[in-house]
């Protein structure tokens, strides 16, 4: 049965989620969008995208919403999620992608509005579970979990790879760096920001900053609790990021063994999530790739039991595809 979905926040992730759901042919119907932006602008930004290109379909708008390939999608504009008529619209699952309701205590307002489930498209606190597809989605329990998080784009890249490495070689401890494209949280030109590094011009600087992705891996892989730390370096690209993980394995390993383990997982249990490549790729080559983790095999380095691996990810498109898969999974469990 098709899951009826509402999107709260039709920004970068909200629009990419919408596109990805159509491209995947997911058993999802987006029936409503809540956003404070006017319908004309929402339709325009869906139709034309500087990264993903022009929408391959017909997009228009009217006073009540946007129209995509002849299907009308209602646009709402309440600021408080509790005021949204999700129940009246038959919305079953809400994708919370505003970035403002990353606390389950606030996101539960969607349930008060009549939705059955909420999926937060960001790391979140006070939720019933955090999930990374390919890693721990089997732990989802429809009976007890109403508000869940899809983690972050970086955690979605790191966790599948860490799962393979932990299961095959054991991880004593590790440090990761995400070389991450700039995001809307940064400043286009130097301007005030609570993070003084993010206050600097995003397209002109490499910007060291924080990430919670390393610690968040333990939310989906409890065996790695307390074993990871990390940081981010924001770089002047609009999308396409790279996770650099250095870890100490429990025993000595070889480059060949690491590559073989990841390749086997990418062709087996993690197919569609983890991708293996030996091509000499650069960041633009993975833009538009739906995998959440693209292992760059030829950059694997080993000294004894000290290992360095690299994995690429399209921090918008790859993440949005994972968000679609998690939403579809949750919808499939509804009675």
Across the structure, where does each feature detected by a protein language model lie?
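Structural beta-strand/beta-sheet cores of well-ordered domains, especially the beta-sheet scaffolds
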Residues: 3, 26, 172, 204, ...
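Predominant activation on well-ordered alpha-helical scaffold segments within soluble catalytic domains
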Residues: 18, 108, 159-166, 177, ...
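N-terminal Rossmann-like NAD(P) cofactor-binding subdomain of oxidoreductases
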Residues: 1-199, 301, 325, 332-334
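Short clusters of hydrophobic/aromatic residues that line enzyme substrate/ligand-binding pockets
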Residues: 66, 131-133, 147, 189, ...
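Acidic, glycine-rich segments within the central catalytic cores of soluble metabolic enzymes
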Residues: 167-238
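Hydrophobic alpha-helical scaffolding
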Residues: 151-152, 206-208, 248, 313
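Short, solvent-exposed beta-strand edge segments and adjacent coil->beta transition regions
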Residues: 144-145, 201-203, 240-244, 306-308
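C-terminal active-site/capping subdomain that shapes the small-molecule cofactor and substrate pocket
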Residues: 230, 242, 246-335
């Amino acid at each position: 049965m098709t899951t009826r979905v509402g999107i709260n926040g039709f920004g970068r992730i909200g629009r990419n989620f919408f596109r990805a759901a159509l491209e995947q042919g997911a058993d999802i119907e987006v029936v409503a969008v809540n956003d404070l932006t006017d319908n004309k602008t929402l339709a325009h930004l869906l139709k034309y995208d500087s990264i993903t290109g022009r929408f391959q379909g017909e997009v228009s708008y009217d006073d009540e919403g946007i129209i995509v390939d002849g299907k009308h999608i209602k646009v709402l504009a309440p600021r408080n999620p509790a005021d949204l008529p999700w129940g009246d619209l038959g919305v079953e699952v809400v994708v919370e992608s505003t970035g403002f309701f990353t606390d389950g205590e606030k996101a539960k307002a969607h349930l008060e509005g009549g939705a059955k489930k909420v999926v937060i498209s960001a790391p979140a606190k006070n939720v019933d579970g955090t999930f990374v597809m390919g890693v721990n989605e089997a732990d989802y329990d429809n009976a007890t979990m109403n508000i869940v998080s899809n983690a972050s784009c970086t955690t979605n890249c790191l966790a599948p790879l860490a799962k393979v490495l932990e299961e095959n070689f054991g991880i004593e401890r590790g440090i990761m760096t995400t070389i991450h494209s700039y995001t809307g949280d940064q400043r286009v030109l130097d301007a005030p920001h609570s993070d003084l590094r993010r206050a600097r011009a995003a397209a002109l600087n490499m910007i060291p900053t924080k990430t919670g992705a390393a610690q968040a891996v333990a939310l989906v892989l409890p065996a790695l609790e307390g074993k990871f730390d990390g940081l981010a370096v924001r770089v002047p690209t609009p999308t396409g990021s790279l996770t650099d993980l250095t870890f100490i394995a429990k025993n000595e390993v070889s480059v060949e063994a690491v590559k073989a383990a990841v390749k086997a997982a990418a062709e087996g249990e993690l197919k569609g999530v983890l991708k293996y490549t030996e091509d000499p790729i650069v960041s633009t080559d993975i833009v538009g790739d739906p995998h959440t983790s693209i292992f760059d095999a030829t950059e694997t380095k080993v000294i004894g039991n000290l290992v360095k691996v690299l994995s690429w990810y399209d921090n918008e498109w790859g993440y949005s595809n994972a968000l679609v898969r998690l939403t579809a999974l949750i919808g499939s469990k509804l009675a």
